[in-house]
A protein has these predicted regions:
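Histidine-anchored nucleotide/phosphate-binding helix
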Residues: 25-44
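Short internal beta-strands
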Residues: 46-54
Length: 145
């Protein structure tokens, strides 16, 4: 049984940036990469990691480890075998809706979130101990609106 069509895009949102070092956590990133590989192998999907710019280098390095080629150009991703994409999502709330609209226009078959931050009703992102980490996070939560 197949889900969607071969070469369908699947967005995987990840990349929570941690204090005090202000670097992305890695367990969500690694899990996202393994999910990306599974989607390619099982369904012929074209996974795209949507993450803060801070995470792009780690994603690019992990792609080869899971046996996938990685591109920032999503048109290329959809034409090459064993490939995936990465999109650096803005941390600026004012720019987020336009970037989200660009991604949505590509009509992904699915959107999955793995340890990505989302703002509360007041527009604030908090870490596990309640600290405000809004300025550190990609505002990819607008993809759910």
């Amino acid at each position: 049984m197949r889900c969607g069509k071969e070469n369908d895009l699947v967005y995987i949102i990840t990349g929570f940036v941690l204090l005090p070092h202000k670097v992305p956590e890695m367990d969500g990133t690694v899990s996202s990469m393994l999910l990306a590989r599974a989607l390619v192998m099982a369904f012929g999907a074209k996974p795209v990691i949507v993450c803060p710019a801070d995470s792009v280098q780690a994603i690019e390095k992990c792609a080869a480890v899971v046996g996938l080629h990685i591109y920032e150009d999503l048109d290329i991703v959809q034409t090459l075998p064993l490939s995936m994409g990465v999109v650096a999502f803005t941390k600026t709330l004012a720019d987020a809706p336009a970037q989200a609209a660009e991604l949505a226009a590509r009509k992904p078959a699915a959107v999955v979130s793995v340890e990505a931050c989302g703002a509360n009703a007041l527009g604030v992102c908090h870490n596990a101990v309640g600290l405000d980490v809004t300025a550190l996070q990609a505002r990819s939560d607008v993809l759910w609106e």
